[in-house]
């Protein structure tokens, strides 16, 4: 897949949002501040008080709280509840944060400062504000020149279940192409595309949900030897199906 279709490129430009600092790469499937989307990911901006974290680390913010000032994911995780599936949950009804901030489900790639998950304003299935995101530190500055690598990945979509979608991501550094799949309770997704080392997204291509719904897949590699991966699959106006995913090289 050396040339992405015009439809895929249009989806990519109109719906995905990319953010990069010296240390952190982030993306989300819907634009902050548009159509009720109040979540924003990027580098941490807050280094004092109870939400302190290292400036530049992976961070997350909400428009109702200090106009979207981002706090570190490490701090955010400490205020969430980890469920039996290893997913951190934070909802407006909890006492850990102010009301009317929506529902979060997110998790962390093992042994890495790479986070992925989703948010919606109400947490009710069908909420069009649903936004998938990832934010990671130590993006891979160079990728392997050859070889095939399999990653064990998990996905997050709060409307699919409170757990994780399971799957694999296969990078062929010889042909500079990738394939992948994610399986959940209601969502079954395949993806494929090109590995583009010098682009903002180091992999970029297509996705198909439930054998018929066309979408976009994109993301980045992390670690000194591309040991981790994180990305998003998004489906145009059907944002309730958007999934964030991440994982590590299979053992």
Predicted stretch roles:
Residues 1-24:
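Gram-negative bacterial Sec-dependent N-terminal signal peptides
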Residues 21-251:
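Mature soluble binding/inhibitory domains
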């Amino acid at each position: 897949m050396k040339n992405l279709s015009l439809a895929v490129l249009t989806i990519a430009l109109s719906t995905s949002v990319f953010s990069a600092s010296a240390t952190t790469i982030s993306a989300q499937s819907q634009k902050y501040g548009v159509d009720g989307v109040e979540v924003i990911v990027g580098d941490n901006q807050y280094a004092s008080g109870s939400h302190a974290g290292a400036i530049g680390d992976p961070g997350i913010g909400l428009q109702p709280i200090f106009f979207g000032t981002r706090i570190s994911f490490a701090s955010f995780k400490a205020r969430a509840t980890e469920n039996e599936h290893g997913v951190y949950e934070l909802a407006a009804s909890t006492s850990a944060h102010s009301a009317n901030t929506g529902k979060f489900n997110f998790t962390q790639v093992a042994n890495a400062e790479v986070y992925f998950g989703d948010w919606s304003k109400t947490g009710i299935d069908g909420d069009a504000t649903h936004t998938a995101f990832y934010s990671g530190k130590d993006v891979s500055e160079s990728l392997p020149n050859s070889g095939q690598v399999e990653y064990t990945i998990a996905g997050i979509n709060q409307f699919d279940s409170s757990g994780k979608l399971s799957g694999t991501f296969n990078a062929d550094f010889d042909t500079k192409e990738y394939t992948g799949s994610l399986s959940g309770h209601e969502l079954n997704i395949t993806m494929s595309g090109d590995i583009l080392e010098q682009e903002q997204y180091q992999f970029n291509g297509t996705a198909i949900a439930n054998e018929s719904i066309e979408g976009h897949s994109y993301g980045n590699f992390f670690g000194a030897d591309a040991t981790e991966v994180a990305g998003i699959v998004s489906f145009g106006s059907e944002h309730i199906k958007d999934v964030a995913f991440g994982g590590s090289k299979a053992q």
